[in-house]
Design a protein with these regions (language model features):
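A short C-terminal helix-loop "cap" of Rossmann-like NAD(P)-dependent dehydrogenase/epimerase domains
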Residues: 168, 224-239
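Pocket-edge positions in alpha/beta enzyme catalytic cores
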Residues: 44, 73, 243, 289-292
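Alpha-helical packing segments of well-folded alpha/beta enzyme cores
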Residues: 55, 187, 251-254, 300
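A short, mixed-charge helix-start or loop-turn motif at secondary-structure junctions
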Residues: 21, 169, 173, 237-240, ...
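Short, contiguous pre-domain boundary segments
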Residues: 1-4, 279-290
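C-terminal helical subdomain
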Residues: 180, 233-285, 295-298
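Rossmann-fold NAD(P)H-dependent dehydrogenase/reductase core
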Residues: 1-225, 307-319
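C-terminal amphipathic/interface module of NAD(P)-dependent oxidoreductases
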Residues: 288-319
Length: 319
C-alpha cells in the first residue's frame, strides 16, 4: 500500500481565489480538493471538459459548499493559454493562488505541441511560463499572491542544451521530462527574484510530490499510441514495491504547504521529508545545483519569452 503522510494545518482560505492547472486528476486534484476544503474558491483549469466536470462533482460531494468552476486550458497551445488568460482577466478578480501543476511524462515517440515545440517542454514548462505571464496583473492585484510551480525529483537529471532544446537531434523521453521540470523550478526561483526586485508582491516557490501514485506515468507513455493496458499493468506492479510510493493526498502536501503556509519562503522548494524525498510530510527539498546557475536561468528566461511570445514587465521597482 502507498504511504499516507499526516495531514497539515491549512489556514482559512475563505474569500481567496485559486487557479490550479491539471486539476482533474493526480496532484492537481489533490491540491484543488484541499484548497476547497480550506474555503478557497478554486478554478480547475483543465483540457478535458468531461474529466473536469467529474472532478468538480467528486470534490463537491466530499466538500459540502465547495466553490468550484472550470476553465478550459490546453497547455500544448499558446492560443488556448492566451484565451484562458483573457477569460480570467475579463472576470476581473485578483488571483491569490496559482498552482502550475499540469504535466505530461515521457511520450513516445517524440511529440510536438500545437506550436511545434517538444510536448513535455511545452506543457510542463513553457505553457506555465506563458500562463503566469498572462495572469501576472491579476496576481499582482491580489497584493500577496502565491505562485507554486510543481517540479519533480526528475529535475535532477535535467540538462540544458540550448542548441537542442526541443530534442530534435536526440530525443530521450525521461531526460526531456527532467529538463522540463528543471526549467519550471528555475522559473519559480527567477519569478521570485523579479517579484522582489520589482515590488510585485508575489511569492513564488516550487514543490515536488515525491513518488506519488498518479496517472502521469500512464498517460504520457501512451500518448503516441502505446498500450494503455500494458502500461497500467506495469505501473501496478511497480506500485507494489514497498517503501517507495505515497498516495495522492500525501503527494499534494508539499504544494499545499508552499501555497498556504505562512512559513513557506519565496524561492523555496518543498518536497516530502522521508527517505530520498520519496514520501512523507512537506519539508525543504534539495535544489539541484543546475537550478542555481544564474547565467542559464537568464538565458532560459529570454528564450522562453521569445518562444512563447509572452513578455514580462521590467523587474525594476515601480513608482
Amino acid at each position: 500500500m502507498p504511504h499516507r503522510a499526516p495531514d497539515i494545518d491549512v489556514p482559512d482560505l475563505t474569500g481567496k481565489l485559486a487557479v490550479v492547472t491539471g486539476a482533474n486528476s493526480g496532484i492537481g486534484f489533490g491540491v484543488s480538493h484541499r484548497l476547497a476544503r480550506a474555503g478557497a474558491e478554486v478554478i480547475l483549469a483543465v483540457r478535458d471538459q468531461a474529466k473536469g466536470e467529474r472532478a468538480v462533482t467528486e470534490i463537491g460531494a466530499e466538500v459540502p459548499g465547495a466553490k468550484l468552476s472550470l476553465q478550459h486550458l490546453d497547455l500544448a497551445s499558446l492560443a488556448s493559454i492566451a484565451a484562458c488568460g483573457t477569460a480570467l482577466t475579463e472576470q476581473g478578480r485578483p488571483i491569490d493562488i496559482l498552482v502550475n501543476n499540469a504535466g505530461i511524462m515521457t511520450p513516445r515517440p517524440r511529440a510536438l505541441s500545437e506550436d511545434g515545440y517538444e510536448l513535455q517542454f511545452a506543457v510542463n514548462y513553457l505553457g506555465h511560463f506563458a500562463l503566469t505571464g498572462h495572469l501576472l496583473p491579476l496576481l499582482r492585484a491580489a497584493g500577496a499572491a502565491r505562485v507554486v510551480s510543481i517540479s519533480s525529483l526528475m529535475s535532477r537529471i535535467g540538462r540544458f542544451d540550448f542548441d537542442n532544446l526541443q530534442g530534435e537531434r536526440r530525443y530521450q523521453p525521461l531526460r526531456a521530462y527532467g529538463l522540463s521540470k528543471l526549467a519550471l523550478l528555475m522559473f519559480a526561483r527567477e519569478l521570485q527574484r523579479r517579484s522582489t526586485a520589482g515590488g510585485w508582491g508575489i511569492l513564488s516557490n516550487a514543490a515536488h510530490p515525491g513518488a506519488a501514485v498518479t496517472n502521469l506515468q500512464v498517460t504520457g507513455p501512451t500518448h503516441g499510441g502505446g498500450s494503455l493496458r500494458l502500461n497500467r499493468i506495469r505501473n501496478r506492479l511497480i506500485y507494489l514495491v514497498p517503501g517507495i510510493w505515497q498516495d495522492i493526498p500525501s503527494g499534494a502536501l508539499p504544494a499545499i504547504f508552499a501555497a498556504t503556509s505562512p512559513t513557506a519562503e519565496g524561492g523555496g522548494y518543498y518536497g516530502p521529508d522521508g527517505y530520498r524525498e520519496l514520501h512523507g510530510g512537506p519539508a525543504p527539498a534539495q535544489i539541484p545545483a543546475r537550478a542555481l546557475d544564474e547565467a542559464t536561468t537568464a538565458r532560459l528566461w529570454q528564450v522562453s519569452e521569445r518562444l512563447s511570445g509572452v513578455g514580462y514587465p521590467d523587474s525594476q521597482p515601480t513608482d
